[in-house]
Design a protein with these regions (language model features):
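Cleavable N-terminal export/targeting peptides
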Residues: 1-17
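Short N-terminal segments immediately surrounding and downstream of signal-peptide cleavage
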Residues: 15-32
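Transmembrane beta-strands of outer-membrane beta-barrel proteins
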Residues: 22-26, 60-62, 111-113, 154-156
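Surface-exposed strand-loop-strand hairpins of Gram-negative outer-membrane beta-barrel proteins
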Residues: 27-46, 130-133
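Extracellular loop and loop/strand-boundary signature of outer-membrane beta-barrel proteins
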Residues: 30-33, 78-85, 122-127, 158-163
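Gram-negative (and chloroplast) outer-membrane scaffold detector with strong preference
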Residues: 48-124, 132-135, 143-145, 170-179
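Predominantly the C-terminal beta-signal and adjacent terminal strand-loop region
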Residues: 137, 145-180
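Hydrophobic/aromatic beta-strand elements that line small-molecule binding cavities or substrate pockets
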Residues: 140
Length: 180
């Protein structure tokens, strides 16, 4: 009886994914300082190590880049704020938990991540960098393509209070996940 229990446990453990890695395209709708918005394109990578069939630890990194109208004080000798064309770079590194449930070829998941973000804004001879703590709440779905590969799509809200006036960004990513 004990041997049967051990063999059944080992067999079911082989069916569980020990973890996964993901790499894909990512879009962010970033709210910058002073209420400005920027549509940024970039990449997102993550790795998950499963500790329970439905719970894992996640490491996540992303980079987003793009043009934006950036506020500048006293442009052209004026005393009011004006906007100049510039560039934005946003990099994030986070750690958190992911809950998931596999049913057939579909695996929906939700995750909560904490970490840091670095935002660089530059335009016409000036630049501004901000670093702050961030929290991300995200949901997504993996659709199994083969035994080891799945297509992942996820979206969520990135919140920070450390940048001037705070920042709320939306992020959506899609790409290939490898399960091991």
């Amino acid at each position: 009886m004990i041997l049967f229990s051990l063999l059944a446990g080992a067999a079911s453990a082989q069916n569980l994914s020990a973890g996964n890695v993901f790499a894909g395209y990512s879009f962010a709708r970033a709210t910058l300082a002073f209420g400005q918005n920027a549509n940024l394109n970039g990449w997102n990578i993550s790795a998950e190590k499963k500790y329970l069939p439905f719970l894992g630890i996640v490491v996540d990194a992303s980079g987003h880049y793009g043009p934006a109208n950036i506020s500048a004080v006293a442009c052209n000798g004026a005393s009011s704020t004006c906007y100049v064309s510039g560039n934005v770079q946003e990099s994030t590194f986070q750690l958190g938990v992911r809950g998931s449930y596999s049913t057939g070829r579909i695996r929906p998941f939700a995750e909560f991540l904490l970490g840091a973000a670095l935002v660089n804004q530059s335009a016409q001879g000036f630049s501004n960098s901000s670093t702050g703590l961030i929290a991300t709440l995200e949901t997504g779905i993996d659709i199994q393509l083969t035994r080891h590969f799945a297509w992942r799509t996820d979206a969520g809200l990135i919140q920070t209070g450390s940048f001037p006036n705070g920042q709320n960004s939306l992020r959506a990513s899609s790409g290939l996940a490898y399960f091991f």
